[in-house]
């Protein structure tokens, strides 16, 4: 499988995307002299700083998110990893979705050796009508030493047949989230499912 390293994929307001059989890591991204990691992108001809890297970020344009959404995305049989807890301030999520994105499936993926795995909704205000309809199935989380397996704000998620091993937090259900879990296995995971943080 191809390995994408030192690259952060940002899918903004796109539709009908399939990513299969790839490996993604931000491990080893250089740090600037200030000691901070900065990722730079080009938007509308201008250079902008986009912050700490996600392996993949899926989002709608936040200015027009109510009408200009992204969706119909399938990510299948991929591997996501970074540097583990020792580098937790250097990397953000492995697979993050924010703003008004809809109709996504994440299947048969392997997430491992990282601090924060998957974020769905960047904050309590990131809850749109009918947003983030997600099927999340047959994924393997191994040694996620922090959180976000996933952290879900808003949206409707069917979370089934996933396996979590040696993780800190499991599925964190928060504001406006509708969640249905079945057939998942949590091995040596301290908080498999929680909804006590504003869910």
Please annotate each region the language model reported:
Residues 98, 151-152, 173:
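Glycine- and other small-residue-rich loops at beta-strand/loop junctions that grip anionic moieties
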Residues 1-2, 15-28, 40-47, 52-54, ...:
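Right-handed parallel beta-helix
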Residues 171-172, 194:
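Extended hydrophobic-aromatic, low-complexity segments
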Residues 189-199:
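Acidic, glycine- and Ser/Thr-rich low-complexity intrinsically disordered tracts
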Residues 35-36:
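Short, conserved, GDST-rich strand-edge loop motifs in beta-rich repeat architectures
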Residues 7-13:
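Short, T/G/N/S-enriched strand-turn elements that build extracellular solenoid repeat scaffolds
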């Amino acid at each position: 499988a191809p390995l994408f390293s030192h690259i952060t994929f940002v899918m903004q307001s796109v539709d009908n995307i399939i990513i299969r059989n790839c490996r993604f890591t931000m491990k080893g991204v250089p740090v600037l002299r200030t000691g901070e990691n900065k990722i730079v992108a080009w938007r509308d001809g201008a250079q902008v700083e986009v912050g700490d890297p996600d392996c993949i970020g899926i989002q709608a344009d936040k200015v027009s998110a109510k009408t200009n959404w992204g969706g119909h995305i399938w990510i299948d049989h991929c591997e996501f990893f970074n540097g583990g807890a020792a580098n937790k301030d250097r990397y953000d999520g492995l697979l993050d979705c924010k703003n008004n994105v809809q109709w996504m499936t994440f299947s048969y993926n392997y997430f491992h050796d990282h601090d924060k795995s998957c974020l769905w909704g960047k904050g309590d205000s990131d809850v749109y009508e009918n947003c983030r309809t997600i099927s999340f199935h047959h994924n393997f989380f191994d040694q996620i030493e922090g959180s976000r397996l996933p952290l879900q704000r808003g949206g409707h998620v069917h979370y089934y047949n996933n396996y979590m091993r040696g993780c800190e937090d499991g599925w964190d259900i928060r504001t406006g989230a509708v969640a249905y879990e079945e057939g998942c296995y949590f091995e040596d995971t301290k908080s498999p499912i929680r909804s006590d943080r504003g869910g």
